[in-house]
Design a protein with these regions (language model features):
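NAD(P)H dinucleotide-binding glycine-rich loop of Rossmann-like/cofactor-binding domains
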Residues: 84-146
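N-terminal Rossmann-fold cofactor-binding loop
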Residues: 169-173, 208, 231
Length: 311
């Protein structure tokens, strides 16, 4: 039996260095689950490591992709066979077959459709944990990269948690109608004056951009406010020390590394229920061989759909 996978064997732009390769399927390893993948989304966290941005811990040759959903096809225990799971910490999810340690397999309830389950890990869990660590009930909140999946979840769930006002910094004007419909106060990324003004009013900032935008906000936040940095979509670092406060960083992998398996598995019980009540972009499904088209959609400014690879 053969496996098909998207590999990168050197750093570079994903469109240039990813290759779809067919290789013989390795022998099954006892103690793991062999998962036949159904869908995997295209996220910034899938593509950024390919460029070499995290070369201190992620390096080629490697299969791309960090999340997705599939069905268990082989296991030591027959009770696993046929169950849908998220195979976390496997060897890359942009492939037809993933071998996953049993403790890192998250069962998916029957009520959750594949296209939602496939994107049920990185962005939802990060947003949920940040709001758990930095609760926002009764507070004013600002999110950057407001059109991104994680920021969209943060904004929705902040309002659900009882945030007073939620501001969203956007880049593409195509995002404006959706932000207004969601009750988010929109701030154009080009309007530094309004961003600075809003920063002076808010209690918590969830920032995925970094660079000059993070620096601008840090310079205008009051001494009781908090800025949580969870990404660098700008590709530019910034000094975490502002005039009044020091930025705090959130990394999902760091949280999982110090959390007992039983505890974080339990988080998903709450997360699945919440996701079923949450607005998400429609999926645009591409066959694995159409991965270039999936990346092209991902790059479109103001896109309204989430690209998924059908594996």
């Amino acid at each position: 039996m053969e496996n098909a996978a998207l590999w990168f064997r050197q750093f570079g732009e994903p469109e240039q260095v990813l290759t779809l390769e067919q290789t013989p399927l390795a022998p099954f390893i006892s103690g793991t689950l062999r998962v036949r993948m159904h869908y995997a989304p295209v996220n910034p966290s899938d593509l950024i490591p390919v460029t070499g941005a995290y070369r201190h811990r992620v390096f080629p040759p490697r299969i791309a992709g960090y999340e997705g959903v599939g069905i268990v096809a082989q296991a030591d225990s027959p009770e696993w066979i046929g169950r849908r799971v998220l195979p976390l910490r496997g060897e890359g999810t942009w492939q037809r077959w993933v071998d996953c340690p049993i403790q890192w397999a998250v069962p998916v309830p029957d009520s959750v459709p594949d296209e939602l389950a496939a994107r049920g890990y990185i962005n939802p869990l990060a947003a949920w944990l940040m709001l758990k660590k930095w609760p926002v009930a009764g507070k004013n909140v600002l999110v950057t990269a407001a059109g991104s999946t994680c920021a969209g979840l943060l904004a929705q769930w902040a309002k659900r948690q009882g945030a007073t006002e939620v501001y969203g910094v956007y880049r593409s004007a195509q995002r404006l109608p959706a932000l207004l419909e969601s009750g988010i106060i929109p701030l154009s990324g080009d309007d530094e004056h309004r961003i600075a003004e809003a920063a002076g009013k808010v209690d918590v900032v969830f920032d995925a951009v970094g660079g000059e935008l993070a620096t601008l906000m840090l310079d205008h936040l009051n001494q009781n406010a908090e800025l949580v940095s969870y990404g660098l979509l700008s590709g530019k670092a910034f000094s975490p020390r502002g005039k009044n406060i020091t930025a705090q960083r959130f990394h999902l992998r760091d949280t999982l590394a110090v959390t007992p398996v039983a505890e974080w598995q339990g988080w998903f019980i709450s997360l699945w229920e919440l996701l079923l009540q949450t607005q998400q972009p429609d999926a645009a499904v591409y066959a694995l061989k159409e991965w270039r088209q999936a990346l092209a959609l991902f790059r479109e400014p103001g896109r309204q759909r989430k690209p998924l690879l059908k594996l």
